[in-house]
Amino acid sequence: LLALVCTEARQERIEIGNRISENLPEIPAELIESLNQYQNTRGAGFAGWTTDGCLLISTRFAETAQAHRVCQPMGMREQLTFYKEPVGGILPSPANAWRPGFVFSKDKGGDEFSQLYWFDYPSRTTTLLTDGKRSQNGGTVLNEDGSLMAYSSTARNGTDRDIWLRDTKTGQS
């Protein structure tokens, strides 16, 4: 009788890496499936308003953030950029701008040399605004009519950040 009392109950032990689990029930497949709807969500970051009143956002799909716009309450997202690399620093043109679109930054292959680009709404084309070389560019601001763009860049020597001013009509910096 004493042997029965002293006998240790059999424990189910699972070791995965550094984690040791003992006597835990298996998680039902239905529970895992129902949790997916809460765990697989996408966030959206507010970037501003377009000149025609649409909401400009950055939304991450898979492993990369891209620019989207939403033009009505409860409306569908319309994806505007389609790159392998994430876009960031999205800045819409001001309400009084001479052309509709937005500035965004993007690097190549994770090289961290962010370049600035212009996305033109009417033509859906993208234009490189900075040197396209081994420089980091960002911190963009536009004046009231979008004719001048100020930004910081390491283009001069690759290290120090300078403030650059670009005429968006002529392309001169």
Named regions from a protein language model:
Residues W49-T50, F61, C71, N96, ...:
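Residue-level signal for WD-repeat beta-propeller blades
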Residues L2-E12:
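Bacterial Sec-dependent signal peptides at the C-terminal "C-region" and cleavage site
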